[in-house]
Amino acid sequence: MSPIALLSVSDKTGLIPLAKALVNDLGFKIISSGGTAKLIESENLPVTRVADYTGFPEILGGRVKTLNPKIHGGILARRDKQSHLDDLDKQNINPIDLVVVNLYPFVKTISKENVSWEEAIENIDIGGPTMIRAAAKNHQDVLVVTDPSQYSNLIDAYKSKKITTELRKKYSQQAFEHTATYDLTISNWIANQSSSKKVSWLQSLPLKQELRYGENPHQKASWYGEPEKGWSGANQLQGKELSTNNLLDLEAALSTLREFGYKNNISNPSYQKAAVVIKHTNPCGVAIGDSPSSALKRALDGDRVSAFGGIIAINCPVDEAAAKEIENIFIECVVAPYFDETAKEILSKKKNLRLLELKAESVQKADKNHIRSILGGLLIQDLDEPSIDQKKWKSVTELIPTDEEMNDLSFAWKIVKHIRSNAIAVASNQQSLGIGAGQMNRVGSAKLALEAAGTKSKGAVLASDGFFPFDDTVKMASDYGISSIIQPGGSIRDEDSIKACNELGIKMILTGKRHFLH
């Protein structure tokens, strides 16, 4: 008796070469339905339609096609159980040896703009997952394939007679993973369309890459991510394999950079061209410039010592001039929406430098949850998204910041939220001058930032991610010539800091919003 393959796929990639190999090279008979059967028939390949095999037509507009005992009995019957084989004989059911199924394109459907509830629901596959799960359960007798990328290996295994138990288990595991991911996607989408709160966190991400190691060589690490979303959508143009620390730094760089926009092109002359330099997930240089090269040079000038071995992110295409700024410094990675051919040629001389093109579309598609692990669980929060509402800011001192100072205060406020708390940023003329990060007291971070800025701090502005518990930071800022301060406010001693500002001739803005980063 010829082996039987059941083929029912939404993604028709590689279907015809597979069907030809099964029929012509391996002697399979094919059972199929709908568009899959129609495509196979168009190639003059023999195929039995499901409705003809079961004797039961498709009903409910195609909702019921393969949900039939002649299909599922053929898949689920164990060949080593005589009672199962007897049942097949009694019911005139043929055993099915291979199930090739992929599912209705639910993800593609819900990704469309303004997709209707009805259209999404109609793209929830029922028969497909049922066949996949049945075949995966009975993997000792039935091979199950769910992705076109598996077809070549499948045919090779048949031809070389290497259909091993291990291969069957591998395909079974991948099949259950496929249906689990599909169900999770549907569950999460329905939850997002309703007002009910999710009672459990469900997410399935495919393995993107096994990393060389974690933050340190003795730690194992893997990278999981949704295809085409966020960093999984980045195209590495050159350089060594990305490391765990590279990815953490790249994420910090992009988070900071998005405060200023992120676009594939800069046709709008008013678009802010920004560059960020990151070291150990903290910004050490941030600046806006008239061109990509100007922004990058100013960001590097913010702290060239710390920039050594860092990560660079630019929110617009990298051209020849920008590439030349990178050419003679040691940098681990550069990420931008685009690198022109001249820039790529210049930077190709730095063989170990990792260049990544990350399109704006991949950034926009990424999940807006911030997830961190704790012992035995996860903490999930909304991203601290780029947003500034100056209408809610309050000028609380006798002196009011000038327009130029307000621009710098806004710039510094965008930066400070991406510095590890306690965080202080000193800036002037849309350029960071000093960063104080991760100190256990706020005045300690202020000291680091002000000392880094040095004499450049005269007339500059200072931003703090949290309120001032005492007036000591104001007094230190005055010693360095700071003109204006921006901070959330909310301390029971706010008046002490405001009083100190008035006495020392410093302007102060309270935003009413805190930006801790742990």
From Swiss-Prot:
One of its GO terms (biological process) is 'de novo' IMP biosynthetic process. Its EC number is 2.1.2.3, 3.5.4.10. It catalyses: (6R)-10-formyltetrahydrofolate + 5-amino-1-(5-phospho-beta-D-ribosyl)imidazole-4-carboxamide = 5-formamido-1-(5-phospho-D-ribosyl)imidazole-4-carboxamide + (6S)-5,6,7,8-tetrahydrofolate; IMP + H2O = 5-formamido-1-(5-phospho-D-ribosyl)imidazole-4-carboxamide. Transmembrane segments: none annotated. GO terms for cellular component: cytosol. It comes from the Bacteria. Keywords: Hydrolase, Multifunctional enzyme, Purine biosynthesis, Transferase. PROSITE patterns: MGS. The keyword rRNA processing does not apply. GO terms for molecular function: IMP cyclohydrolase activity; phosphoribosylaminoimidazolecarboxamide formyltransferase activity. Residues 1-146 form the MGS-like domain. Pathway: Purine metabolism; IMP biosynthesis via de novo pathway; 5-formamido-1-(5-phospho-D-ribosyl)imidazole-4-carboxamide from 5-amino-1-(5-phospho-D-ribosyl)imidazole-4-carboxamide (10-formyl THF route): step 1/1; Purine metabolism; IMP biosynthesis via de novo pathway; IMP from 5-formamido-1-(5-phospho-D-ribosyl)imidazole-4-carboxamide: step 1/1. Belongs to the PurH family. The IMP cyclohydrolase activity resides in the N-terminal region. This is Bifunctional purine biosynthesis protein PurH. The gene is purH.
